[in-house]
Amino acid sequence: MQLLPHDTVEDILERVPVKSLLRFKSACKQWKLTIESQYFQAKQLICSAGGKDLNLVLVSEVPKRYHIYQLFHNSCDGLVCLFDYQTLNNIVYNPATRWHRRFPVSSTNTWRYINPSSPYRINTSSSRGHALYVDGSLYWLTGKKEIKVLALDLHTETFQVISKAPFAEADHRNIITRSLNNRLCLSVSKPLQQMIIWSFNSENKTWEQIYSIVNRSVTQSLPVAILEKNKLLCCPRSNSRQLMIYDIKTKSVDSVSIGTYRCGDSVFCYFESLISIL
């Protein structure tokens, strides 16, 4: 039987789950070199993120007597960041491969400052100080009288303030930053009345209103993901054991059970990857 060209084999391997890819590294030397290459890992991540299957991470509370790690709010290229309360270390972890790397605390002088620094102070102790990662940049809400979006490009290490937002005068307590379809989105809610979701176009620096929802149960929820373009996956704020799928066209709501788990503020999409940090 004639062997398949290696390019064809690569196309097949890109669609294989990460757990299987780790086993396939033992099949032959060529497969091992392919799977461990940065080029293949980047292609596998694109394939995983663009697939129809959706993986969710639900963060549950556990008793403080256990040695626990705080999970930050979303993932980046299949990696999550954990904080160790005992050692005060940050840990980058790949749930799919079990790879991890521990980073030293800031007091060890192994970190450097970004210059020029942020034009606004980032208060990490408040909900507005929580960063959102989208497509190579970190985003924060900032400003007092006028809501603005602060962006940090991780490639150029430069800050930028995104002003002229259509929600600039909204109550910051009703604004939530989310990554939907790999774009920065903000939901602006009027509880029990309306939820408007804005999407940011990073190329022309403009905001586009993509949804306006008046369903009561949805306006009190957190948007998680866009499904099939016309459906919005939401998480209730009531620590529920169910997620909601809102159909934009029919304006109907379906419930999705998550078993014994409860959802809260920390619910985000996750895509498997082979990525690690050298």
Curated annotation (Swiss-Prot):
InterPro entries per the UniProt record, alphabetical: F-box-assoc_dom_typ1 (IPR006527), F-box-like_dom_sf (IPR036047), F-box_dom (IPR001810), Gal_Oxase/kelch_b-propeller (IPR011043), Kelch-typ_b-propeller (IPR015915), SCF_F-box_component (IPR050796)
UniProt cross-references to PROSITE patterns, sorted A to Z: FBOX (PS50181)
Residue ranges occupied by any F-box domain in the UniProt entry: 1-43
SUPFAM superfamilies in the cross-refs: F-box domain, Galactose oxidase, central domain
Coiled coil: none
A UniProt-annotated Pfam family: F-box
Cited PANTHER family: BNACNNG10540D PROTEIN, F-BOX PROTEIN CPR30-LIKE
Entry protein name: Probable F-box protein At1g14315
